[in-house]
């Protein structure tokens, strides 16, 4: 009997379920989209039932597609949008409020007050994060303070908090399991990443009762079994990780110094720093990459707010292209003499600048600027921002050699050969595109398969990582330096200050 791994990839706009074979190839894939809700400016919410129904429906659809039953599934692995926050009734399972999504900015005022009171150094030292509405801690506090009766019920032990993984585990197990993994816990502002435990000082700071919190476990291990009524037989749940950490695992970035970058609407790059957390001096985040056998592996993380969204803007905002797939071909026809730069700060700039209030700009426009130059500027903006992240990572990590680290890439944008070649050119480093594009789901599947014995130890799994294509630098050094200097000049104009070379 074929043994399969069912990977649940719960994202911001859709949920996907994939069945992986023992050789890590995909046997089935199902996807269901669901709406986001925007009740006020800067607010983003999900209906918890949408998260649950889309998960259940896609899992069942993937099983039907593969002609497989629950007994052919060795284990389930879950990966999820991080930081999105839910609180529900322990007895009924009913959420007390819609899920507050990671993009939501409603707690900006609370974060600003806590910064003014001098609390950010404590938060950063314990958690590796910044005091920002992005993370779960202030979202929890908002729900407790704004939903009538929620704080009293939480103090009485009647409520449970979880990121999306915890909520799905609760629902899948029929309310028998209230747990999370270390990668998701590390995104809450409440978890000491050095001790691997919830932090009492931070709980007091945000006024959150410990009884609300899930138990924290390894990323690969026992997370309970599904209610037998859901799929016809119980299925063990054996792996959990936040989406960017799961992609790091799926890319087999197990050695210190290995870097992966995921390109979707935005971009997230993680550098494995091994068993020791590295405090950033360049506004990167320090986070847990994964936890296996009680041992934590850490990473430096940088986030770019706009990657694929720049191409969506070309298509939907300007009408420059009819489809995203056209952008690379159009960029290839751009005039090399036209040095046009797009700084895509549509919602501010992320790492390593963290300037939420600046807005985007185009530099270098002339009467000769055409759609081709705009397309090139949009795609190059992603490459320039990645170069900024990797420069910050090399500066932060003392064990890095500062030379051309290979970058492993995944996400929708990596299908563009032109963009990947330009990325390699501007990084002066090889860019590796894997054969298996669904690296986030593969990471969740691997963590589950490792726990149930279907997949080998990390070192052997890494040997089976399959390269589809390597892009190697082909741009002359002086050209690269001129283009990077032009980018930093454009960013400096936007910020109103010089941006130094790394």
Curated annotation (Swiss-Prot):
Q: For binding ATP, which residues are annotated in this chain's numbering?
A: 12-14, 265, 308, 312, 412
Q: What is its EC number?
A: 2.7.1.30
* One Gene Ontology term, aspect cellular component: cytosol
Keyword field contains ATP-binding? yes
Stored Pfam families: FGGY_C, FGGY_N
Give the record's pathway.
Answer: Polyol metabolism; glycerol degradation via glycerol kinase pathway; sn-glycerol 3-phosphate from glycerol: step 1/1
Q: Which GO terms describe its biological process?
A: glycerol catabolic process; glycerol metabolic process; glycerol-3-phosphate metabolic process
Reactions listed under catalytic activity: glycerol + ATP = sn-glycerol 3-phosphate + ADP + H(+)
Question: Which SUPFAM superfamilies does this entry report, sorted A to Z?
Answer: Actin-like ATPase domain
Regulation of activity is described as: Inhibited by fructose 1,6-bisphosphate (FBP).
Origin superkingdom: Bacteria
Q: Residues that bind glycerol, according to the entry? A: 82-83, 134, 243-244
* Major enzyme class: transferase
- Which residues are listed for ADP binding in this entry? 12, 16, 265, 308, 412
Keyword Transferase carried by entry: yes
InterPro entries in the cross-refs: ATPase_NBD, Carb_kinase_FGGY, Carb_kinase_FGGY_CS, FGGY_C, FGGY_N, Glycerol_kin
Write out the residues that bind sn-glycerol 3-phosphate. 12, 82-83, 134, 243
Q: Which UniProt keywords apply?
A: ATP-binding, Glycerol metabolism, Kinase, Nucleotide-binding, Transferase
Extract the GO molecular function terms from the UniProt entry.
ATP binding; glycerol kinase activity
Similarity annotation: Belongs to the FGGY kinase family.
Q: Tell me, what does this protein do in biology?
A: Key enzyme in the regulation of glycerol uptake and metabolism. Catalyzes the phosphorylation of glycerol to yield sn-glycerol 3-phosphate.
Q: Name the PANTHER family for this protein.
A: GLYCEROL KINASE (PTHR10196:SF78), SUGAR KINASE (PTHR10196)
Q: What is this protein called?
A: Glycerol kinase
